């Protein structure tokens, strides 16, 4: 008899709205580049990550593929051959959280390769690593700041390209590796280098709840869940289903979302004004703003989408002094947004005036 294991529902997490939003946006568009969650222990970081995996819809995979290949997307060499022969069978499975141990070696992460066998058999000679297991799942790194920098680079390269590439003695093997990357850390235990910080799409600082009612609600919900997980899960089932459907619809809408040239120029202008050198910042803001628009059921990006995206994508890319926490110059950002809105309103008024003039001219003809 199989015992059902219930995960604490995502929609039952009290507070931490910014963290939850950052996770949802990455679920809508993994190309955002993951999220770094900074905060002390006991602030629902790992609970939210596991709850997200349980919340997300099932994925379609190639049956028996060690890399969870998407039958409608990028395929490994084995699946390509199966597709050519018309033997590509598919199945569905739940997404899962793949944990990366702090002491993981490079071989454990990217996989091990038998060179002699690889020359003859190609990808079949690969002993899959964590990046194979993580493909189309959630890769979770707790205490990412304690991980070896080289391992972080390997992970972030794979996350950016969507492929894990293994090169040994002139032999090159690759397989799809696109995942939702989530790193958590306690800043009191050490910071990440700016070069590494920049590679994470979004960053969120989480703190303990300071509202008495919220803290009491957490106690009640955790006790209720521990006492009867099934009943508690069913209590939030409707909310879970609604959020799941909203994410599915946002994914479908994402490619239809457009952003105006005015907003693109504004994003780049803000990044320059704030002294952010990397172009990755601009690109991440655009991708995040589009995901926000899709999440809100729109096919166009607004200035409010851009503002919210900047609050998630820019703080960790700001220049700062040693031991100074990452933070965004909110006053400067607010000022620039107000200036943009005023200019936009002025431009719209001028357009309306020109329209009125054209109407009058046509009436006089």
Curated annotation (Swiss-Prot):
GO molecular function list: ATP binding; ATP hydrolysis activity
Renumbered to this chain, the Basic and acidic residues biased-composition regions fall at: 344-365
Keywords in alphabetical order:
ATP-binding, Nucleotide-binding
UniProt xrefs under SMART domains: AAA (SM00382)
Question: Which InterPro entries does UniProt cross-reference here?
Answer: AAA+_ATPase, CHLI-like, ChlI/MoxR_AAA_lid, Mg_chelatse_chII-like_cat_dom, P-loop_NTPase
According to the record, the segments passing through the membrane are: none
Which residue stretches belong to region Disordered?
A: 340-365
Where ATP binds, per the record, is at 40-47
One family name in Pfam for this protein: Mg_chelatase
What family is reported? Belongs to the Mg-chelatase subunits D/I family.
Q: What is this protein called?
A: Magnesium-chelatase subunit ChlI homolog
């Amino acid at each position: 008899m199989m015992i059902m294991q219930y995960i604490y529902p995502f929609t039952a997490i009290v507070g931490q709205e910014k963290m939850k939003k950052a996770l949802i946006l990455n679920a809508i568009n993994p190309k955002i580049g993951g999220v770094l969650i900074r905060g002390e222990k006991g602030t629902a970081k790992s609970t939210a990550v596991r709850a997200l995996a349980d919340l997300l819809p099932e994925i379609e995979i190639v049956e028996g593929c060690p890399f969870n290949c998407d039958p409608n997307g990028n395929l490994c060499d084995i699946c390509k051959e199966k597709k050519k022969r018309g033997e590509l069978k598919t199945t569905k499975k739940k997404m899962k959280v793949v944990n990366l141990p702090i002491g993981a070696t490079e071989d454990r992460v990217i996989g091990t390769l038998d060179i002699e066998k690889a020359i003859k058999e190609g990808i079949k000679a690969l002993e899959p690593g964590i990046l194979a297991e993580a493909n189309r799942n959630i890769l979770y790194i707790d205490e990412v700041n304690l991980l070896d920098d080289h391992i972080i680079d390997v992970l972030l390269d794979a996350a950016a390209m969507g492929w894990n590439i293994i090169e040994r003695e002139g032999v090159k093997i690759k397989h799809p590796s696109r995942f939702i990357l989530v790193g958590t850390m306690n800043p009191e235990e050490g910071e990440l280098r700016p070069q590494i910080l920049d590679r994470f799409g979004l960053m969120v600082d989480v703190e303990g709840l300071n509202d008495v009612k919220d803290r009491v609600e957490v106690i009640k919900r955790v006790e209720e869940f521990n006492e009867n997980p099934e009943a508690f899960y069913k209590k939030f089932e409707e909310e879970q289903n609604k959020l799941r459907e909203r994410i599915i619809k946002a994914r479908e809408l994402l490619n239809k979302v457009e952003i105006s040239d005015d907003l693109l120029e504004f994003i780049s202008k803000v990044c320059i004004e704030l002294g952010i050198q990397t172009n990755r910042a601009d690109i991440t803001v655009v991708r995040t703003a589009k995901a926000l628009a899709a999440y809100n059921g729109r096919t166009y990006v607004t200035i409010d989408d851009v503002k919210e995206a900047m609050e998630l994508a820019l703080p960790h890319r700001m220049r700062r002094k040693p031991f100074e926490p990452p933070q965004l110059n909110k006053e400067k950002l607010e000022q620039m947004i107000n200036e943009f809105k005023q200019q936009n309103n002025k431009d719209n008024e001028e357009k309306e005036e020109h329209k009125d003039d054209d109407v009058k001219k046509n009436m006089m003809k």
